[in-house]
Regions:
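Receiver (REC) domain active-site loop signature in two-component systems and cognate sites
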Residues: 57
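Acidic catalytic/metal-coordinating carboxylates
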Residues: 35-38, 61-64
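Short, conserved "switch-loop" micro-motifs in signal-transduction and mechanochemical regulators
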Residues: 84-85
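Two-component/phosphorelay signaling modules centered on CheY-like receiver
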Residues: 12-31
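Active-site beta3 strand of CheY-like receiver
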Residues: 46-52
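C-terminal output helix
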Residues: 106-115
Length: 120
């Protein structure tokens, strides 16, 4: 059965890019969200195997969304995808419960490696 992925980013082109990379490699995209609030509700609704999560988004940022998702499901696998690659941001994301951090702009190989690692 295909690994199910929820893609969260406020930029439509980033969602399209991630969807393209992942679907071409056998992953099933089960949902998309453009902010943290929608990410949390989509997660609860579709129960994906992995989430790709941006940090800077309107209404609720990605760090807060990760905390809420992990509170709902401690086993959730969330990969942060952000242009904010400063060490403090990466540490904050990992402490919030993210299992990996990809810095934008990213290579397709890096995304695939992170998803493979997350689902183990």
């Amino acid at each position: 059965m295909a690994v199910r992925v929820l893609i969260v980013d406020d930029a439509a082109f980033m969602r399209i890019m991630l969807k393209d990379i992942l679907s071409k490699n056998g992953y099933e995209i089960v949902g998309e969200a453009e902010n943290g609030i929608k990410a949390v509700s989509q997660f609860q609704e579709v129960k994906p195997d992995v989430v790709t999560m941006n940090i800077t988004m309107p209404e609720m940022d990605g760090i807060t969304a990760v905390k809420e998702i992990k509170a709902y499901d401690p086993d959730a696998k969330v990969i942060m995808c952000s242009a904010m690659g400063q060490q403090a941001t990466v540490v904050e994301a990992i402490q919030a419960g993210a299992c990996d951090f990809i810095v934008k702009p990213f290579q397709a190989d890096r995304v695939l490696e992170a998803v493979r690692k997350a689902v183990g």
